[in-house]
Structure formats: structure tokens, C-alpha cells
Amino acid sequence: MPNLKDLKNRIASVKSTRKITKAMQMVAAAKLRRAQESAEAARPYAERFNAVMAGLAASVGGSDSAPLLLRGTGSDQVHLLVVMTAERGLCGGFNSNIAKLARVRANELLAKGKTVKILTVGKKGRDAMKRDFAANMVGHVDLSGIKALGYANAQDIARDVLGRFDAGEFDVATIFYAKFQNVVTQLPTAQQIIPAAFEAEGESDEVALFDYEPSEEAILADLLPRGVATQIFSALLENGASEQGARMSAMDNATRNAGEMIDKLTIEFNRSRQAVITNELIEIISGAEAL
């Protein structure tokens, strides 16, 4: 039979844990609202930017004068995987799902004889990827000291990636992040950013409505680096909302599980205490009968 003191200590411990998880749930809920608003506010700009770039890219086509960021190196031998996760845990499967998608892609590429290089953004992604791909790691971006991610942070990451591309370190770059759907659903996503892969929305004839000065190629050469930064910034915002949604959901589950455990331990405590009282009564009655 469990010791009553041990049961009381366990109940007190679980109650303390429940207070912590409840507080974390409330903090995540507050952060989620801000992160979700930021992600949703950025989507129209990103979508419109994507549409403009798609039109420009379509007008240039496969021209030899097209910027290198658009036409690529002509090879897909070396791949850079930019794995974007959180700095902290306690957010369900958010980090592990992104890392899992990146690992699957890395293994597929390696099986095809491709060279894989990995750049991580966020501590959890680095920890997850280095277990299996330590030899493939080429860099890490630490965001632990940043309270609110901004476009400047995306520009820093973009400069790192673009610098590696200009140096001929890779042919194709893909970012991995979680696209926010709702509080309980965050979709692990892989998106190619180099060579630029823009998808046009609407009729393709819309491209002919615009005349560009000085030229499509010149405008693309200026906008494509910004496009990389914009895509990375969008991924950071989606990740931020997804992380808080996953943490809120995970802490809600933890709080409910703690409540159920407290109920079970309380029942066990009451039964044990009742058994102790019953035994004491039996001893008293037995002693009285002996007299």
C-alpha cells in the first residue's frame, strides 16, 4: 500500500506542475495572437510579390541573360537545406516534424548521389540534425537573444545563403519550416528559394499588360535577393505562429493530463487513508474485545 506521505507529496508536485503548464499555455495563447496577426498580415504582400516576380520570370523565360538566381547554375548536384526551427522546446511535435521532413529530404538526395549541406536556424533544429548529419552541417544561425524577429533577421539569413551561392557552395537551396494552419495544425513545408521558383496566379496573359524599365532582367537582378529575404521572413513568421500554437496545444494537453493524474492520486490517497483508519478501528475493537 502506498505511503500516505508519498502520495501527498506526489499530489503537491503534480499540482505545482499543472500551475506551470497552465501559465505556459496562457503565455503561448497571448504570443500566438500576436504571431498569428503578423503572419497573416505578411501573407498578402508575400503573395503579391510572388505574383509580380512570377510575371517577370515568365517574361524572361530561359534566357541566358536571366539572373543566376533565376536560371540557376545548370546543375542540381549540391543542395543546401535551411532547416528553420525554434530555440526552445515544450511545443509538441513542432520541431521534430520539421527536422523529420528535412531528414527525409536529405536521405533522398544522398540516395541519388547528391551532395547535401545543412544550415540550421534555431537550436532545436541544430540538435536534431547533427545527430544524423553532423558531417553535412555547414552553419548555424542563433536566434536565442532575439525577442521579436523582424525583417532584418531574415535579411541576415538571406545574406548568409546568398553569399554561399555566390561563392559556388551549392546549386539548390530549400528552406524547411512549419506553415501555420490553426492552433492544432502546423504543416511542415519544404520550399525551394534558389533557383527562384515563383508560381504565377491567375491568367498567364496578364504578363503582357506591363512594360518594364530598364528591363526585366535588370529588375529581376535587383528584386531576386529581396525575394529570398522575403521568403525567409515569411517562413520565420509562419514558424513563430506555428511554434506558439503547438506550445499552447501541448501545454493544454499537459494541464489536462495533470488534472487527471491529480484526480487518480487523490482517489488513491483517500483509499489508502480509509484503509489506515479501518485498520486502526479493527485494532481498537480487537483490543476492546480482548479486555
From Swiss-Prot:
BP GO annotations: proton motive force-driven plasma membrane ATP synthesis
Superkingdom of origin: Bacteria
Gene3D superfamilies: 3.40.1380.10, ATP synthase, gamma subunit, helix hairpin domain
Record's subcellular location: Cell inner membrane
Molecular function terms from GO: ATP binding; proton-transporting ATP synthase activity, rotational mechanism
Keywords from the named record: ATP synthesis, Cell inner membrane, Cell membrane, CF(1), Hydrogen ion transport, Ion transport, Membrane, Transport
Topology of this chain in the membrane: Peripheral membrane protein
Pfam family membership, one: ATP-synt
Cellular component terms per the entry's GO annotation: plasma membrane; proton-transporting ATP synthase complex
Sequence similarity: Belongs to the ATPase gamma chain family.
UniProt subunit comment: F-type ATPases have 2 components, CF(1) - the catalytic core - and CF(0) - the membrane proton channel. CF(1) has five subunits: alpha(3), beta(3), gamma(1), delta(1), epsilon(1). CF(0) has three main subunits: a, b and c.
PANTHER family: ATP SYNTHASE GAMMA CHAIN (PTHR11693), ATP SYNTHASE SUBUNIT GAMMA, MITOCHONDRIAL (PTHR11693:SF22)
Reported function: Produces ATP from ADP in the presence of a proton gradient across the membrane. The gamma chain is believed to be important in regulating ATPase activity and the flow of protons through the CF(0) complex.
Protein name: ATP synthase gamma chain
Annotated organism of origin: Ruegeria pomeroyi (strain ATCC 700808 / DSM 15171 / DSS-3)
Phylogenetic placement of the source organism: Bacteria, Pseudomonadati, Pseudomonadota, Alphaproteobacteria, Rhodobacterales
